[in-house]
Amino acid sequence: MTRKILAVLLVFTLVACNNAEKYSETDVEDSPMIQERRCEPSGKPCRPLMRIPCCGSCVRGKCA
């Protein structure tokens, strides 16, 4: 009886770990914090509070 309970617990643990590993991989792929940040290179026109900021700073309407 004890062996059956231990076997069921072992199988349940393995299945739970496998599912957790699978879902953690998809979370990393979909996470916006992990994605590479985009920025405008120097010389591109800019303005304060742009959706995609300059890689450096915005000086006189151009990325520096």
Curated annotation (Swiss-Prot):
Belongs to the neurotoxin 36 family. 02 subfamily. Disulfide bonds join C39-C55, C46-C58, C54-C63. It comes from Chilobrachys guangxiensis (Chinese earth tiger tarantula). The presence of a 'disulfide through disulfide knot' structurally defines this protein as a knottin. GO terms for cellular component: extracellular region. Expressed by the venom gland. Probable ion channel inhibitor. Residues 1-20 form the signal peptide. Residues 21-38 form a propeptide. This is U6-theraphotoxin-Cg1a. GO terms for molecular function: ion channel regulator activity; toxin activity. The lineage of its organism: Eukaryota, Metazoa, Ecdysozoa, Arthropoda, Chelicerata. Keywords: Disulfide bond, Ion channel impairing toxin, Knottin, Secreted, Signal, Toxin. It is found in: Secreted.
